[in-house]
Amino acid sequence: MNATQEQLKVKLEQALIAAFGDEYAGVDPILVTASNPKFGDYQANVALSLSKKLGQPPRAIASAIVEKLDVSEICETPEIAGPGFINLKLKTAYLEAQLNAIQADSRLGVPTAKHPQREIVDFSSPNIAKEMHVGHLRSTIIGDSIARILEFRGHDVLRLNHVGDWGTQFGMLITYLREVSPEALTTANALDIGDLVSFYRQAKQRFDADEAFQETARQEVVRLQAGATDTLHAWKLLCEQSRQEFQVIYDLLDVKLTERGESFYNPLLPTVVEGLEASGLLVENQGAKCVFLDGFTNREGEPLPLIVQKSDGGYNYATTDLAALRYRIQKDEAKRIVYVTDAGQANHFAQFFQVARKAGWIPNDVELVHVPFGLVLGEDGKKFKTRSGDTVRLRDLLDEAVSRAHADLEERLKAEEREETPEFIDKVAEVVGISAVKYADLSQNRTSNYIFSYDKMLDLKGNTAPYMLYAYARIQGISRKGGINFADLGDNAKVILQHDTEFALAKYLLQLGEVISTVEADLLPNRLCEYLYELSKKFNTFYDRNQGVQVLSAEEPLRTSRLVLCDLTARTLKLGLSLLGIQVLERM
């Protein structure tokens, strides 16, 4: 809800009490944005909801509310429409004052959260000795955008990368490398990441087929857990090599993370089991220690347990996740913990959240949120893979997007007979390519699957990153064409609204805070994408020579006023795109 809506809501609540008494304090006035501008800007529907309780027709209730409603500083005289809707139209002077205020505000009128708190966003989380693939794309960029929005709202955000850096796979890989490439276990970067991944696959095949190899691999895991010097050194080298490769991707995507892998929680795993035992939740079932869950059954309809210690004494993902959760609440003092993973893990989160609640580990003031997302599909509607059927490497996907953006730009420059330096072309292609991939993902409702299409995401038309970047660059072009520095307009430059397209743009600019606040609550970045796309369209209509207004050739004071609207649009686009992890371009 934006500042204007907040004010109107308070005024309506006061009018309700004045008209019908104190018992109506706290009644929701049901204030919504008007669906049609001809009915005003906002509509309160509370009269219809109170008709039965008050035993009066909705129009009579609406009249009684309007009689006590004092919104003269904000709105024109309220009107009652239809069965009892209260329509509110913002005054031009009020709109102008609001725009002048955000023009002087570096945050564009977006307030910080009333109660800032420590929040954790757990995202990306690739596995050591494996390359990041298209499956990591969504977690990484959705998590990054959520973290950026929470940070902008003033929360203290810890961005955690829960890397898969522990487990049986290391015993398997180290055992295999001792045979085929022992130098990789003693020397940094003896292998490139592609070879490491290939050896991992070969090790897995050997592990599945050879019992003697399996036994040796398990002994290697025991040595690792016991801290054997050579095995621990080998493990650290393998982790560091993968870490370097991950960092290349994170740098390309401009994503910041604090790594805290599964191994970090190893010393805490026994205390998880002890804690569950002490709370009376732990049951031994076929030698394994587990907790039975409410609402989860197997195919036979029998209660489904969450295993926290295997019959051989080993631990699993659930144990690690429970240890991590306790640490994040007790040591990190997080008040909201957000996990960004694919929707296929929804049951896992529901299960270990339930166990933690039953154990009393989650205080009432701590919120746990699983942020699920759908699959990335190929244009055939199936899971996105290479032609050979392999999973698409994330690095290859990003490189291809940049390469295509490069080719598109060179083609456009040729058509425009325009010359640019190779450095300019490379920079623009990288920003456009990476931004296109990010925006194509973030603009979808994250709970849905989406089809990955280079052609669509790189299109200069439609709800795409290139369209947004072009809208921003176009406004910077206006300043260059007019020889104007927007920063020099100054806080004294006043907005004057006359034309319909000016009003439409102005009202939309004032909705940014409401949109960001909504995304903070529901963690759906596509809402911000929709807002920025609509804003770009409204600006293009405002600037259109047939539908809109003259800007540079307008007489003063309208010229300066319209330049302020241009500047506010550009700043809103820049801020909004930055919260999606997208940088803008002054020229394209």
UniProtKB/Swiss-Prot annotation:
Gene3D superfamilies: Arginyl tRNA synthetase N-terminal domain, HUPs, Isoleucyl-tRNA Synthetase, Domain 1
Subunit architecture: Monomer.
The name this protein goes by in its record: Arginine--tRNA ligase
CDD domains assigned: Anticodon_Ia_Arg, ArgRS_core
HAMAP family: Arg_tRNA_synth
UniProt entry keywords in alphabetical sequence: Aminoacyl-tRNA synthetase, ATP-binding, Cytoplasm, Ligase, Nucleotide-binding, Protein biosynthesis
Family, as annotated: Belongs to the class-I aminoacyl-tRNA synthetase family.
GO biological process: arginyl-tRNA aminoacylation
Swiss-Prot/TrEMBL catalytic activity: tRNA(Arg) + L-arginine + ATP = L-arginyl-tRNA(Arg) + AMP + diphosphate
Cellular component terms (Gene Ontology): cytoplasm
Subcellular location(s) per record: Cytoplasm
Short motif ('HIGH' region): ranges: 126-136
GO MF, one example: arginine-tRNA ligase activity
Pfam families: Arg_tRNA_synt_N, DALR_1, tRNA-synt_1d
Record-linked NCBIfam families: argS
E.C. numbers: 6.1.1.19
